[in-house]
């Protein structure tokens, strides 16, 4: 009586073990297929800078290096000092009276007086004229109202742009805009696409619209002195 019962228990145990083994084998392919998905989910994402911005920056650097290397622009130090290689105080000629127009006594310019010099000069020489002849500097602009009034002041001349006192100092990632008189760069009125798509290290004001543009510092333009 005991032997048939023992035999039945042994057969039942072997059958249960066989079913467990088949179930384990049938699940293993699903586990293997899921492993790559887990790896992909856990892999950290890497952010990359937009290629257009990177290429644009490289193009700007190449343009500036070409301009500086050609000698067409005077060297501007990190503090905005004017180079004396091209002109000195001794051989500087003051602009003729008919080449200048003064804007003073206007309620819109309580912080200073402005002078338009129509005789075109490069940026460095324009700054030297402002400093030596009028004891001032190329104009710095800190509000839209002043920018608008200066643009209204110069829009009648037969030139598209005039120098103001903004320029780039530093190189590469350390580049920044500064006013040549040392005042805070707390306002800007750039034209569309500027300053990123502009070339040159000096800043002009457009006589139509009053927007600002970057320009090669060696170009000769009329300019605005503040004193």
Swiss-Prot record:
Nitrated. Its main location: secreted. It comes from the Eukaryota. Glycans are attached at residues 24, 70. Residues 1-16 form the signal peptide. Pfam families: Lectin_C. One of its GO terms (molecular function) is heparin binding. Gene3D superfamilies: Mannose-Binding Protein A, subunit A (3.10.100.10). One of its GO terms (cellular component) is extracellular region. SMART domains: CLECT. SUPFAM superfamilies: C-type lectin-like (SSF56436). It is found in: Secreted. GO terms for biological process: defense response to bacterium; defense response to nematode; immune response; negative regulation of interleukin-10 production; negative regulation of macrophage cytokine production; positive regulation of interleukin-4 production. Residues 34-46 have a biased composition (Basic and acidic residues). Residues 58-70 have a biased composition (Acidic residues). Residues 21-105 are annotated as: Disordered. Disulfide bonds join 130-225, 202-217. Keywords: Antibiotic, Antimicrobial, Disulfide bond, Glycoprotein, Immunity, Lectin, Nitration, Proteoglycan, Secreted, Signal. Cytotoxin and helminthotoxin. MBP also induces non-cytolytic histamine release from basophils. It is involved in antiparasitic defense mechanisms and immune hypersensitivity reactions. This is Bone marrow proteoglycan. It comes from Rattus norvegicus.
